[in-house]
Amino acid sequence: MQNLLTKLEVADFEFLAEIIRSRVAFTSDKHLRAAISAFASETQSTDKRLALCALVEREIRYLGSSDAAYFLRKVSHRTGGPGVTFREVVTDVFRKLKLKQPDALCTDEELVEHLVQAFTTLRVRQLPFDQQKVLLESAGMSASDVGTYLKNNSARFALPAIIQLAGMAAAQRIVTNVVIGAVGNYIGTTAARSMVTHLATRFPVWGQSLGPIAWTLTGLWTAYDLQGPAMRKTIPISLYLGLCMLRDGGYDTDAAEPGAAGDAR
């Protein structure tokens, strides 16, 4: 997981901290905030970056564990730390969202990239025709291309086809809107808007990609998606990490199918 976290920027850590924060349990909000501030004051420091990454990993692994199990592993000094592994966290997210994991062995970065692409594919397929149309048009596709595409593909939306038809930039806009809309569903639209506004100053392409459709999507997904308390944190964290890994265009142009689970509702 460290290879994944070391690719993040200060703004990413701040976003994750907002999701992680909790008034209960073993989370260390104060320590996490202090580590982010220390890294922000000296972003070239390898030691400060690694210390922050280690703390974030610990928090995420804790969130994927039950309090009782975490405490028992903590007092028994379990090798590798008391939390479940990051891969276990993401595997549980795949299961909760009813998405199929990739069959081939892959890195943590590739795993969360696949998660985001499969999630986007499933969610867009579930949208009503008119919402799909708005989403695709907001990604920069012409009305003519959108009409042609949806006429035959509204139930079979696939990112590789979008990349072929409209280019990588359009695919990135679609994924960004869907993922940020989903994160807003879990942490609240007001909080998500505030955090995204901050992120847009660091990553202008995200600011350009996000439109009103992202917040419309937030309202379309039902309470089913909210899952339990832990999943309300591990799902948006995993999706956000996947979005970060795709920021430089690492899309799988072959496929990222949601799998045989079908409609996740």
Where are these regions (language model features)?
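Terminal export/targeting leaders at protein ends
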Residues: 1-163, 264
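Anaerobic metallocofactor- and corrinoid-dependent redox/one-carbon enzyme cores
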Residues: 2-7, 11, 19-22, 173-174, ...
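Compositionally biased, low-complexity segments of secreted and virulence-associated proteins
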Residues: 124-213, 227
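Membrane-engaging insertion elements
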Residues: 179-263
